[in-house]
Amino acid sequence: MKLEDIRREYLQNALSEDNLLDDPFKQFETWLEHAVASNLPDPTAMVVATVDDTGQPSQRIVLLKHLDNDGFVFFTNTGSRKAQELKGNNKISLHFPWHPMERQVIVYGEAKPLPTSAVAKYFLSRPKESQLAAWASAQSRPVSSRKVLMETFANMKNKFAKGEIPLPDFWGGYCVVPQKIEFWQGGAHRLHDRFMYQRQADNSWQITRLNP
């Protein structure tokens, strides 16, 4: 297989500063709405990049669960690798790869832990099976087999058979407060359109076109 021959031209759209909204959150919402309306699979899926204390980065796909003018919100097991890395270094990057639309968005910022009340509100909105899975999984830690995992899930199902499933004390959430947000639109001949929003001291945003 010749990987160097695998390519395609990006011809769907062009992006100019005249097309951009002044507010990057509103611009993101507009693009996300387009992704949802276009029936893209998992339009809220984002690659979350963190770094450990040796400088080794790691990535994983997580779902965006809320967006407002404070930032981008996701939830996770606080014993997970990403949560442990964020304890030591809360710098974070998010990547939304909307390939069918020839678009991507990259967010650079800091992850701020959410208050327990916000975490509990979201946790209780999840399907019961997802709540049980949160209790059953010691995320990122070794497990001897899937059978063991499913047995733990069954035990949790029995344990919480009646009443409301409580919020695990090892489950939390983060708001990613962005300092920079890049919007990328594929262009013909690899002459892509890239615009970077950078937060200013007064919380306004400066927009700069970048070379592809």
Swiss-Prot record:
Record has Oxidoreductase as a keyword: yes
GO molecular function: FMN binding; pyridoxamine phosphate oxidase activity
Keywords: Flavoprotein, FMN, Oxidoreductase, Pyridoxine biosynthesis
Cofactor(s) required, per the database record: FMN
Pathway as given in its UniProt record: Cofactor metabolism; pyridoxal 5'-phosphate salvage; pyridoxal 5'-phosphate from pyridoxamine 5'-phosphate: step 1/1; Cofactor metabolism; pyridoxal 5'-phosphate salvage; pyridoxal 5'-phosphate from pyridoxine 5'-phosphate: step 1/1
Catalytic activity: pyridoxamine 5'-phosphate + O2 + H2O = pyridoxal 5'-phosphate + H2O2 + NH4(+); pyridoxine 5'-phosphate + O2 = pyridoxal 5'-phosphate + H2O2
Function: Catalyzes the oxidation of either pyridoxine 5'-phosphate (PNP) or pyridoxamine 5'-phosphate (PMP) into pyridoxal 5'-phosphate (PLP).
HAMAP family xrefs: PdxH (MF_01629)
Protein name (Swiss-Prot/TrEMBL): Pyridoxine/pyridoxamine 5'-phosphate oxidase
